[in-house]
Amino acid sequence: MIKEALIVKTTALPQSRIALELEIPSNTCKSFVSETINSISRSAKIPGFRLGKIPKQVLIQRIGINQLYASALEKIIDKSWKEAIEMESIEPLSEPELVDGFESLLKNFNPEKTLKINLQTDVAPTLKLKKSKGLSVEIIKRKFDPKSIDEALEKSRNQLANIIPVINRPARLGDIAVVSFKGIYKDSKKAIDGGSSDSMDLELEKNKMIPGFVEGIVGMKIDDNKTLNLKFPDDYSHEESRGKEAIFEVSLKDLKEKELPELNDDFAKQSGNKDSLKELKKDIEKQLKENFDNTQKNIKIEALMDALSKELDAEIPKAMIDIEVRNNIEQTAQRFAQQGMDIKSTFTPELVKTLAESTRPQAEKNVQRNLALKALSESENITVEDKEINQKMKEYDDEISKSQKQIDIQKLKEVVLNDLLKEKLITWLEENSTVKEISEKVTKSTTKSKTKSKTKKESQAKSEPNKKKKEKK
């Protein structure tokens, strides 16, 4: 007797999805049903029968044919799916989706007949670049601002400041206020989630808290109470509060100020372990210039990556975006865990949902860029040789030998490969593209001119109906 084989038909769908129609012969279905019954029989306990010796009909009557079929059907789908993707050399990006649903399939399941299953899954998209050479981008030409050195020194002074109590004067910007407050929504009188504290140290700086909160405390004296009528910004992080009016009852419990150290050689020794203030300034300038140059380089790379992404011709499947979103959330959770936070209590379903929504646009951008770089690698045959990977891996030898954790060498090699390939691709982009630096003044001038032109057109559009009315009269 010739054993019947699984029949697979595939159809390409939009958004890099593929449909698979499977025809599973009745012999396979009967075999799985029989195997399921035997498996349950070996472990089922029914009074009056020895373990493993329960008659088939008794078992079916006791457990129910529907439950037996459901168990067998799950195994049939799983095995047939794995066999089908191997036969067709398909690399799925997502779990298979049963088009007709499991319940519908179970309702019509008959092991005496050929079983037809319709499945869909996401697959890697076909990549093509409309253009790779001769890309042109514009970036704003910026100069290093020497004022940033003074700002860095001032920041360091603030960090090393002594905190002293304020006596006989009202609060002012720059102070540290110890406040208690309670907030409610003006319309519903409902308490604001996270909008209260019995004691909180608040640096009185603009843009801290919601608009008007810090400004409302400025001028208060210790033991003063004040009612603040404020409004949450329309783009506030907490969705429930956006655009709502609120009432805060605030009490100033204590007031402190910072006593800043003098800028001298002693400060240089304390702040940066340098012998003199002059030496400290030089060191800060060097670091800031390096950071500035790196930032400018990254701006250029970002612009080139965006330009290349726009040239990508591909239907990106939803599964790819979902995977990127999930990876981002997992990385965030790992960072929180390293800080000692309880992940289980912190990462509630609501927070995970919020993070998924907020990180999705960036995830889409990341996937688009990565696919564009992959397409460039394929079209220009840009690769990384084994000797390059091995050379780079030597840099990690010392770190690997000292590490107390088990390091996955193969995974590290993959990371090194991806990093080296990305470096090569970006270098190729820089060499084969045009980057034009435009003055910040030109950008502002162009923006003003566009705004004026838009305002003029809007004004003309508004006056046009009035002109027509006069003509009719």
UniProtKB/Swiss-Prot annotation:
Domain of life: Bacteria
Annotated PPIase FKBP-type domain residues: 174-261
A GO BP annotation: chaperone-mediated protein folding
Signal peptide: none
Compositional bias (Basic and acidic residues): 456-466
Any GO CC annotation of this UniProt entry: cytoplasm
Top-tier EC class: isomerase
Subcellular localization(s) per the UniProt record: Cytoplasm
SUPFAM superfamilies the UniProt entry points to: FKBP-like, Triger factor/SurA peptide-binding domain-like, Trigger factor ribosome-binding domain
Keywords annotated in UniProt: Cell cycle, Cell division, Chaperone, Cytoplasm, Isomerase, Rotamase
Listed HAMAP family: Trigger_factor_Tig
Protein name: Trigger factor
Organism for this UniProt entry: Prochlorococcus marinus (strain MIT 9515)
Gene: tig
